[in-house]
Amino acid sequence: MLKKDMNIADYDPELFNAIQNETLRQEEHIELIASENYTSPRVMEAQGSQLTNKYAEGYPGKRYYGGCEYVDVVETLAIERAKQLFGATYANVQPHSGSQANSAVYMALLKPGDTVLGMNLAHGGHLTHGSPVNFSGKLYNIIPYGIDESGKIDYDEMERIAIEHKPKMMIGGFSAYSGIVDWAKMREIADKIGAYLFVDMAHVAGLIAAGVYPNPVPHAHVVTSTTHKTLAGPRGGVILSAADDEELYKKLNSAVFPGGQGGPLMHVIAGKAVAFKEALEPEFKVYQQQVVNNAKAMVEVFLERGYKIVSGGTSNHLMLVDLIGRDLTGKEADAALGSANITVNKNSVPNDPRSPFVTSGVRIGTPAITRRGFKEAEAKQLTGWICDILDDAHNPAVIERVKGQVLALCARFPVYG
């Protein structure tokens, strides 16, 4: 018999210690990876519920198993809240991840070998937008577009490439681009050549939900997102559309199940429902505006200290620090900052002479620090410490000093108070 007082600490102390150590790491490290965030205890409560026991292949009202009357309620709540949040007429909350949501879109709209226009990974795109090591690059004919010398998307060049290659689908969205994307312009180009416009808004979904970044849903045929990152929900994916095209919706549903997945993760879908409800609250808008304010404050200090920011600034939650010309690789910067309890990720920058495993840049994002309460003053102070380390990355004394400052700041702003 299963008993409610069963726990990991007594049964599996080795695993429990790893979990405890990760909890401590999150409290004592400053998280600047742009794709990471802290989810709420309410979301974690949903994910730890008995919903994890339930198989529910199919969709609400059309399941292949019995006993789904309550998980139908859960999934319907998630669907309706997602639609409300983004102004969609269709939502599929079953994808296990953003990448699986993206693969479902490819499966629904394309055939292997079809031509796709996607943002170059080296210019800020994502693996699933056509990288040769990803399914998207292996199964489809990918034509990349990129950014100009100013670090902004070149829509004239995009249009020229689109007219020349006539892709069946154009992809908007990014994993490392700090500007505003003109979704309407992309739809205009797509319509000129009769292509689908697919937008992956994973990185900026929270900003979009709060109205501080343009919403692609009214412009794209289909939109995907993760539910973590700026949305601050559980790790997972979602597909949205406002195309009012029932045939398209059927294709998307079929591509998720049975096309790419079996049973949905009902405990995670419950977590998504909670996160969408949280994102509909007024304070979520305040949070997202602060995310952008903090990012702009950090850019200001980087520029003052002589560091180059790709595109010269940011209009969202992230920035790319360009280290080309400095005697410091992205990998070295990542490691040095990590030693001071500041977590970033090395990242390729445009025209990067180094490999993706070494890189000449670091990507920095503000969702997590804002979630724990940092405002502009703390963001600027932190950026100064980062610059101190980048200026002298091989100096243990500098790293140790900054680490002490980081620990003191983290103690003032606990993640879970």
Swiss-Prot record:
Pathway in which the depicted protein is active: One-carbon metabolism; tetrahydrofolate interconversion; Amino-acid biosynthesis; glycine biosynthesis; glycine from L-serine: step 1/1
EC number assigned by the record: 2.1.2.1
Cofactors named for this entry: pyridoxal 5'-phosphate
Molecular-function GO term, any one: glycine hydroxymethyltransferase activity
Pfam (any one): SHMT
Catalytic activity: (6R)-5,10-methylene-5,6,7,8-tetrahydrofolate + glycine + H2O = (6S)-5,6,7,8-tetrahydrofolate + L-serine
Residues annotated to bind (6S)-5,6,7,8-tetrahydrofolate: 121, 125-127, 355-357
Modified residues (N6-(pyridoxal phosphate)lysine): 229
Cellular component terms (Gene Ontology): cytosol
Subcellular location: Cytoplasm
Top-level taxon of origin: Bacteria
GO biological process terms on file: glycine biosynthetic process from serine; tetrahydrofolate interconversion
Annotated positions for site Plays an important role in substrate specificity: 228
Record flagged with keyword Transferase: yes
Signal peptide: none
Subunit description: Homodimer.
Family: Belongs to the SHMT family.
Free-text function comment from the UniProt entry: Catalyzes the reversible interconversion of serine and glycine with tetrahydrofolate (THF) serving as the one-carbon carrier. This reaction serves as the major source of one-carbon groups required for the biosynthesis of purines, thymidylate, methionine, and other important biomolecules. Also exhibits THF-independent aldolase activity toward beta-hydroxyamino acids, producing glycine and aldehydes, via a retro-aldol mechanism.
Name of protein: Serine hydroxymethyltransferase
